[in-house]
């Protein structure tokens, strides 16, 4: 089937690259892997060959039918469940649980993997990082986005996206995939990122939304000094904020991009005490 531009489809069929993506998940035999946008099933086969039980969510009606019917999934001893639907709307945990035998114990954590359409990368990342978190997330995304996610403090591309994800996960940018590997070729290169949720995230689950809003506000005018950026985020006078920052051990004249994710977590705790 031809890729649909409306769905942002760019098919990847290079077995070597797909194998590296599947290896990055670190699959244990029998582990459930949720695949976002399986397309023609090329990555699906690689996951199956490594012993995964695959739950695949496919929005394209034709591709979903192919995978459910005479497509590649049915030839793998029933270890594929295809869900036709929008991955942004489907309840991932419910569909995974529905494929498991009934048990009085909570279902084990699953992994998430996918070749992600560029136009829905941000909301998919947000959904993937909504608790309860997967064991690991491996996404093929636009290289520019991968660079931003993995960028360290002080980098010109370090920002709210970097802080938000690094506060919850260990981030690894694994390798680049050139545009020419896809059909049709996108205009830019892609990269594979692996996000491993931290055993102890920097911010408690119940404060994740507040943390995200606070960090976005601090970076909304990234050239401002820290005292002004934080003052705008918490609604206080810059002079008052500057004194508080000094008391916390921060230089109020720094730019927000100089702070590590743990520093933003400390500032959020301070702001809650105002």
Model features per residue range: what roles?
Residues 1-101, 105-217, 246, 257, ...:
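Catalytic cores of RNA-modifying enzymes
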Residues 215-274:
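C-terminal lobe and adjacent flexible extensions of AdoMet/dcAdoMet transferase-like proteins
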């Amino acid at each position: 089937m031809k890729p649909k531009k409306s769905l942002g489809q760019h098919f990847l069929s290079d077995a070597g690259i797909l194998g590296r993506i599947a290896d990055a998940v670190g699959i244990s035999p029998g582990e459930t892997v949720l695949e976002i946008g399986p397309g023609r099933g090329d990555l699906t086969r690689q996951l199956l060959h490594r012993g995964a039980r695959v739950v695949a969510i496919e929005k394209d009606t034709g591709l979903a039918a192919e995978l459910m019917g005479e497509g590649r999934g049915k030839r793998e001893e029933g270890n594929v469940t295809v869900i036709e639907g929008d991955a942004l709307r489907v309840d991932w945990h419910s569909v995974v649980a529905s494929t498991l035998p009934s048990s009085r114990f909570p279902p084990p954590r699953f992994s998430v993997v996918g070749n992600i359409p560029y136009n829905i990368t941000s909301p998919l990342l947000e959904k993937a990082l909504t608790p309860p978190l997967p064991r690991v997330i491996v996404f093929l995304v636009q290289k520019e986005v991968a660079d931003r996610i993995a960028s360290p403090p002080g980098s010109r591309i370090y920002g709210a996206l970097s802080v938000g994800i690094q506060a919850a996960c260990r981030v690894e940018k694994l390798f680049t995939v050139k545009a020419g590997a896809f059909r049709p070729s996108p205009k830019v290169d892609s990269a594979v990122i692996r996000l491993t949720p931290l055993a102890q995230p920097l911010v408690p689950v119940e404060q994740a939304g507040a943390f995200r809003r606070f960090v976005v506000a601090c970076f909304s005018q990234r050239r401002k000094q820290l005292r002004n950026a934080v003052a705008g985020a918490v609604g206080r006078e810059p002079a008052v904020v500057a004194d508080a920052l000094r008391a916390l051990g921060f230089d109020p004249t720094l730019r927000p991009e100089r702070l590590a994710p743990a520093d933003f977590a400390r500032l959020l705790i301070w702001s809650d005490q105002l």
